Amino acid sequence: MFANAAERWSEIITGAADGSSLSLTIEAGGIPIDRGGVPGEGNVLGRAAPTGLRNGLPSNGIMEFDTFDLDRLENDGSLVNVIIHEMGHVLGHGTIWRRRGLVIGEGSFDPQFIGINAMEEFGVLLGTNRPTPVPVANQGGPGTEGAHWRETTFGRE
């Protein structure tokens, strides 16, 4: 499942943020996994973050999964989606936005992500074809608010 998640991210990330060429290899075996760090069935399914940066971008990270939920997630077929989600946090999605100045209105009713590529794609999704700031979570605990797309806009991403 980790290899499938890594393959999915290799399909999503096709170039460097600055437009230069990029050779990206995601090794699922290279991300330490802690299966017991998030206690309680049905609560937080997992958490993840970069543990090192190189040139301001993640170079390695860690993912933790709640052992209380793993069997259920595997049985209902959603574990790979949770792994993809957490692997995205290791890659910087929601975890380095603040450091890079990519969220405006943080702590307000309407925080927004202002990465140019995401704004361009969000404008296409809206049918305006104009770069549009992307709504991010305006509620939730640490690791959720300001670090995920807003569920009222995108559902459970």
Region roles according to the model:
Residues 1-84, 89-157:
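Extracellular zinc-dependent metalloprotease catalytic-domain scaffold
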